[in-house]
């Protein structure tokens, strides 16, 4: 059975993006993302893949869920949610969903874990994380990252209630 872990960073108001980019640079969050996802397959949408320069992230199987035809070396393209579910069933692993908002919305109902970073900033964004009913989840781990006695971000790990 595959584990499906949604991983993202959001600001204090739930914004996750602006103009198809991450609207902040927090090196601690980037390191956290790399540590969590390296060695695991990642799933993303076409726009998120394009934001990476149409190049796969190294040391991870990169899966792009899109209805469009894209030709990218080193990437598995899946054209439907049904096809992705079949792939997950046939290839058990811990998968990390890396965005964007539409992909999070589509995969949230089958997710088993959430890895959220809350950036201690308020930005003006154009993309929010889909609404999550946290009553269905329980917090299993959290820690704050501070620099010069200032809270920079909070890392959280959630698991689905069973």
Walk through the language-model features, giving the residues of each.
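Enzymes that bind and transform nitrogen-containing heteroaromatic metabolites
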Residues: 2-162
């Amino acid at each position: 059975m595959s584990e499906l872990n949604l991983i993202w960073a959001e600001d204090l108001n739930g914004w996750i993006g602006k103009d198809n980019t991450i609207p902040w640079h927090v090196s601690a969050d980037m390191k956290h993302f790399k540590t969590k996802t390296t060695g695991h397959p990642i799933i993303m949408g076409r726009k998120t893949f394009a934001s990476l320069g149409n190049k796969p992230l190294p040391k991870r199987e990169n899966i792009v869920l899109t209805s469009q035809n894209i030709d990218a070396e080193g990437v598995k393209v899946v054209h439907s949610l049904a096809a992705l579910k079949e792939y997950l069933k046939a290839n058990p692993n811990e998968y990390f969903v890396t965005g964007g908002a539409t992909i999070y919305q589509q995969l949230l109902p089958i997710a088993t874990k959430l890895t959220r970073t809350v950036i201690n900033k308020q930005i003006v964004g154009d993309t929010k994380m889909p609404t999550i009913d946290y009553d269905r989840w329980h917090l299993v781990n959290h820690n704050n990252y501070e620099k010069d006695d200032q809270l920079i971000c909070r890392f959280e790990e959630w698991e689905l209630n069973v």
